[in-house]
Structures are given as C-alpha cells and as structure tokens.
Amino acid sequence: MERLTDLPSIGPKLAGNLEKIGITSPEQFRTLGAEEAFLRIRAQVDPTACLHQLEALAGAEAGVKKSLLPPERKAELKTWYQGL
C-alpha cells in the first residue's frame, strides 16, 4: 500500500486534504492518527470538515470502511467531535 487512496474510506478529495497538511503516505497518516489529521485539516484546509470526514479518517486508520467502524468507536468519535 503506497497511496493514501489505497486506504479504506480515503477518496481523492480526502487524500488531497491530507496531502495539503503534509501527509503523503499511509505510514505518515497512521503515525499522525485520525483525530490529529482531522484537526489539522480543519485548521489548515477545510474549517467545515464534518463528522463523516472524521469517521472516514478513523476507518482508514483502523483499516476498515467507515461504515464498519464499531458503534462504540463511532460514539467516541461523535463525542470528541462535539467537544471541538
């Protein structure tokens, strides 16, 4: 796996946002983590980034499509997002 778009739930637009914050590989993304990547995207690229984008990042980090994230993880992400 060499491209960001090889990760589950990462399409061209989200990959482009990750590249704009300096993340160009799946390894860099995993090192940074979903929440930190989301914060940087919101701060530097897209201040309107939503919960769905956060879930996509979390799915990519876990290696699954966002629809397959466990309900507990989705609830955790929602609580975290609402606290921003």
Residue ranges, per PLM feature:
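Alpha-helical interaction/regulatory segments in DNA maintenance proteins
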Residues: 38-67
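Sterile Alpha Motif
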Residues: 1-8
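Catalytic DNA-binding helix-loop module of base-excision-repair DNA glycosylases/AP lyases
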Residues: 13-21
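DNA-contacting surface of Y-family translesion DNA polymerases
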Residues: 60-63, 67-83
